[in-house]
A protein has these predicted regions:
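N-terminal membrane-targeting/pre-transmembrane regions
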Residues: 1-17
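Membrane-cytosol interface motif
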Residues: 66-84
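Short histidine-centered loop motifs in beta-beta connectors
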Residues: 110, 157-178
Length: 195
């Protein structure tokens, strides 16, 4: 396992803040001889910092390639499976599968299919809670369409949540992508839909 490069700055800043808070607690609490409270604050700050480090973890995965399959692009829980009318690019009825990523899930996303990136668009928007039904259409999001070698097209979206403010995408139109290649890092809990 390694740490995603998008997390280096946040991990460093949060580590510095935790050290500063610990130093303040030390000087405030040791003078009062409240050692048990000092140990408790040390534990809380360490757990907070380890949580931030774990949020940016990028586990090594066995990359499987199968051109007949569409792989789940992220960790999480399937919350919606329904037929929808896709009006942005494909303009037809498609099967939508939405996956909710909680704060404890790995926030790396992988390309669900291999092929050529045919369409990519960033949509500014609101920051509704990720499980809100309108979050798929009203929240900040990116939309990507990959054309597989067979000609079939797969559309997938990264959708920001209530706390999310950043979606970092590595996609460009015309780019050839491999199935299960690292696609994006989402810096907060979110929802992911693909059609």
């Amino acid at each position: 396992m390694r740490i995603n490069k998008e997390g280096y700055k946040i991990i460093g800043i949060s580590g510095a803040v935790c050290l500063l808070l610990w130093w303040l607690f030390y000087h405030l609490l040791v003078h009062d001889a409240n050692v048990s409270l000092l140990w408790f604050s040390t534990l809380v700050l360490l757990l907070f910092w380890f949580f931030i480090v774990a949020f940016f973890r990028e586990p090594r995965r066995v990359r499987i390639h199968d051109t007949d399959l569409v792989f789940a692009p992220c960790d999480g829980r399937v919350v919606v499976t329904e037929v929808v009318s896709e009006d942005e690019y494909l303009k037809e009825e498609m099967l939508q599968i939405s996956i909710f990523m909680s704060i404890t899930n790995v926030h790396m996303n992988w390309v669900p299919v291999g092929g050529e990136v045919e369409y990519f668009k960033y949509h500014p928007g609101r920051f509704l809670v990720a499980w809100h039904p309108k979050s798929s259409t009203e929240n900040e999001r990116t939309t990507t369409v990959v054309r597989m070698p067979s000609g079939q097209k797969v559309l997938f979206r990264q959708i920001a949540g209530l706390i999310a403010r950043r979606i970092i995408s590595y996609m460009t139109v015309g780019h050839q992508v491999e199935q299960n290649l690292s696609l994006i890092h989402i810096s907060e809990p979110t929802r992911r839909s693909y059609i």
